[in-house]
């Protein structure tokens, strides 16, 4: 029997889940994040031409989350997987509500500003938007609900060897590199995925082209390491342009008039 990542306890003992459960555990979060991204983008009516970008990044992030829920005891694995699944699904729903009410998505860096704006003053509007958004919120939460109800029977949440979790992290790295390759393909337009990946502005375009989860990850990254390329960097030298009539001081013959 091939190595499936589970700890062996006694020779000849049969793994309770087998290869199918192993694959289900590994692919649980990649499948969930791809589902959430596709449902999110279809509902928000974004350009699906960028789906290859955020699908690959979703798979990479999914492998990372799967690795976090593999090497612990059964109860800890189960609790971690269910909490992560519900939390991430709620984040997608919350961003839809934020876009509906505030006409923009909100990353972690904007939470302080949002708190300062006393959002409680808009509690009625928020409550109304949440009620109207219940159908899409339930669709987003559906996989997490099924995981909470039937996850123990379907995937088992058995403890896997730490080395196997390391292999899953390796898959995360491979797909992340693949995602960077897709980002740097020759996409059309002024704001391409490659440019948006380096920015800390244009969050709506980032969400559309890079995906919601990648945008939020980049927002956290840029809170620690400031972005090098923003929209403002294209115009930072405008203030150094010479005003009318100052060209004569530059030594340009065209700027001087002989008397």
Question: What is each stretch, according to the model?
Answer:
Residues 239-245:
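Long, well-ordered, tryptophan-enriched scaffold segments
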Residues 2-6, 10-227, 244, 253:
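Transmembrane and membrane-interface helices of multi-pass
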Residues 230-232, 255:
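Helix-hairpin-helix/helix-loop-helix acidic hairpins
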Residues 233-234, 238:
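Intrinsically disordered, low-complexity N-terminal segments that are enriched in acidic
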Residues 247, 254-259:
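Beta-strand elements within well-structured catalytic alpha/beta cores of enzymes
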């Amino acid at each position: 029997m091939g190595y499936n990542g589970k700890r062996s306890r006694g020779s000849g003992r049969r793994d309770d889940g087998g290869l199918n459960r192993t694959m289900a555990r590994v692919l649980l979060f990649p499948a969930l994040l791809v589902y959430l991204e596709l449902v999110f983008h279809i509902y928000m009516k974004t350009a699906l031409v960028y789906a290859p970008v955020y699908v690959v990044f979703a798979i990479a992030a999914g492998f990372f989350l799967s690795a976090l829920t593999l090497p612990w005891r059964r109860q800890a694995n189960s609790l971690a997987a269910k909490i992560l699944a519900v939390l991430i699904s709620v984040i997608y729903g919350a961003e839809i509500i934020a876009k509906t009410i505030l006409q923009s998505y909100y990353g972690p860096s904007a939470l302080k500003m949002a708190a300062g704006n006393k959002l409680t003053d808009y509690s009625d509007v928020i409550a109304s938007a949440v009620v109207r958004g219940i159908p899409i919120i339930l669709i987003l939460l559906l996989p997490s609900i099924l995981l909470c109800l039937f996850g123990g029977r379907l995937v088992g949440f058995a403890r896997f060897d730490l080395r196997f979790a390391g292999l899953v992290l390796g898959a995360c790295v491979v797909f992340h590199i693949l995602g960077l390759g897709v980002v740097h393909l020759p996409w059309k337009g002024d704001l391409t995925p490659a440019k948006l990946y380096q920015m800390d502005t244009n969050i709506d375009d980032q969400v559309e082209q890079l995906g919601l989860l990648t945008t939020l990850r980049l927002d956290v990254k840029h809170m620690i390491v400031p972005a090098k390329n923003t929209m403002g960097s294209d115009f930072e030298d405008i203030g150094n342009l010479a005003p009318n009539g100052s060209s004569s001081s530059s030594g340009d013959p065209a700027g001087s008039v002989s008397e």
